[in-house]
Amino acid sequence: MKRLSLFAATVWAALTLAGCAGTKAPVPTLEAWNDFYPGDVHLTDRSPETRGSQIWHAIVPNPEAYIQGCAREVLHTLYTSPADTVVPHLREIRYRLEDYGGISEKSGGGDHVRIRYSTRWVERCFGNDGDTARVDHETRGVLYHELTHAYQLEPKGCGSYGDGGEYWSFIEGMADAVRLSCGGFEQDFASSDRPRGGHWSKGYRHAGYFLYWLNQNKGNDFLRRFHRSAAELPVWSWDAAMHHVLGPGEQHSVEALWREYQQAVGDSEEQPVTE
């Protein structure tokens, strides 16, 4: 019995090494999504008189192609291929420009989603120097984040968005990890875009850069597999998801991986853990 258990453990470890930690899986191509229809795009501009609206339209002359192109990038980052059975199919993306004090938000659900984007924020990004590249970078980045909310899986058995717990940190952490992976944040860990210290449970960029680092260092399909764990685990948690993707062992607990990440990017005085 002991010999059989040892054999099973050895086989499992070999499969884990082959498919997970630190190895390079075949990278699915973005072109595989060219024929996937991400949904009809309907643009509403509620503040056409604002400078922000005029700047946005100058940068985005073809809103449908712009939004659908970003949607395909998001889908490519979240899922292995259009044939994946858990890929959601949206019928409609309603995108609204509006002069308000926030930045952006996604609402709706199922196969109809709504995204609101602030023309006031566009003006702020444009600045006095008229930096259209900055506006485009920010507009794409925000759109990647909101479209992730439209297409991402939702974990089960771990609370709700409103309680600010593991469900919330997964939802917002994945959205910023996808934004980062698509180039919507600076991918250099020394960049000012990356928050220093903190904790993965803070979601957003804290979790986003952590997940991006794991994808770079624990297998280049880590992010897709971590995301898919939301569909595969009946009771989801960050710790359970890490073990689900990377295997058993204390070194694969979320706290151990967070410490390893913090050490690797220079946010901890401790030496990096080596496996």
Residue map of PLM features:
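Second-shell loop/turn segments in exported
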Residues: 52-64, 125-138, 159-166, 195-200, ...
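C-terminal motif of bacterial Sec signal peptides marking the signal peptidase cleavage site
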Residues: 18-19
